[in-house]
């Protein structure tokens, strides 16, 4: 099986209600608030080290039994800039995509430097389901 690094669309960032724990020396997000500044329409989005997916895409990931992820609630808001520029856009429901898999083993994994690694099966699913504005998708060498 082949694996890929993917850098999803960044449509915003952490909102003020995001809770981050740095007590272990690493950044661990306890509660995620994603605030949109713009949106090109992808159903997988990033704000390092977190990812969110549309509910529709999360259902497809579950239907395919892809490994290395679980889903949780995320608070979604729109910035003033978003509301001014995108008056006619309704955002779908998003969920927090918590990646807990091993890179190069599971369908979704995170490297030590916080890069998202996906299997070819996951890549095919993402490409068929509204992920077309990723900053980059590159082959991961073993």
Say what each PLM segment does.
Residues 1-142:
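Acidic (Asp/Glu-rich) sequence patches and key acidic residues
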């Amino acid at each position: 099986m082949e694996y890929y690094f993917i850098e999803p669309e960044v449509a915003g960032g952490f909102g003020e209600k995001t809770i981050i724990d740095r007590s272990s020396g690493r950044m661990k997000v306890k509660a995620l608030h994603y605030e949109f500044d713009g949106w090109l329409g992808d159903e997988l989005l990033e704000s390092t080290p977190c990812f969110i997916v549309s509910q529709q895409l999360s259902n497809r990931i579950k239907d395919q039994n892809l490994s290395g992820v679980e889903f949780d609630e995320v608070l979604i808001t729109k910035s003033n800039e978003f509301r001014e520029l995108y008056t006619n856009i309704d955002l779908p429901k998003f969920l927090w995509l918590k990646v807990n898999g091993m890179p190069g083993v599971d369908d979704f994994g995170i490297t030590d430097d916080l890069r998202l690694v996906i299997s070819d099966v996951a890549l095919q699913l993402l490409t068929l389901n509204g992920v077309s504005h990723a900053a980059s998708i590159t082959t991961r060498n073993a």
